[in-house]
Amino acid sequence: MASTRPSHLIRTAVALAAAGLALAGCSAQPGTAATVNGTTISENEVDEATSEFIALTGQQDVTPVAVLNTLVEGELLDPIAIEAGYAVSDAEVEQFFLEQASAAGATQRPDVESEAFLDLGRYLLQYNEIYASPDAQAIFAEAETARQEADIEVNPRYAQTDDSGAFVPTVRDWIHQGEPAPTPAG
């Protein structure tokens, strides 16, 4: 007489598959660094913008978390800035990067290859223009309200958000956070 009950292995496999599906539903899509009100910022975009920013400025200490935070802030500030009259074109961003490269002593025109790097520059320009304006306080208050009301999900690989919504870089207890390795003399 054959048993109609599933074997222990099949039950275990089904339970593991169900648990995997449940966990997958709780995490960001693969390759996603963050989503802001449904708009995805991919890990590739963060990596490209970080690399291009380091190449432009020479600042080796710029982290993907800082770039991701800026891209998220830019996603929130841009529509508010445009409405307040602080729209910035791609050409203006490229000119800004050229000026930054020149000020840093670069002899070559900086490569602006990614849309995310343009978005990073757009945020920096808009922020600086708004900061210098008489209506800065009102615009930044509106941006802060937008941030508090936004649906922001951050891949835990990059950061977590604290109660104020600020990004806190993820630190893994099992990864030693010691001094960086010395660079070879050369």
Where are these regions (language model features)?
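Short, low-structural-confidence N-terminal segments
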Residues: 1-62, 148-186
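Residues at structural and domain junctions
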Residues: 12, 32, 67, 128-129
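Hydrophobic membrane-targeting alpha-helices
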Residues: 21-25, 80, 129
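N-terminal targeting/tethering segments
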Residues: 28-117
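PPIase-associated folding chaperone regions across multiple families
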Residues: 98, 105-186
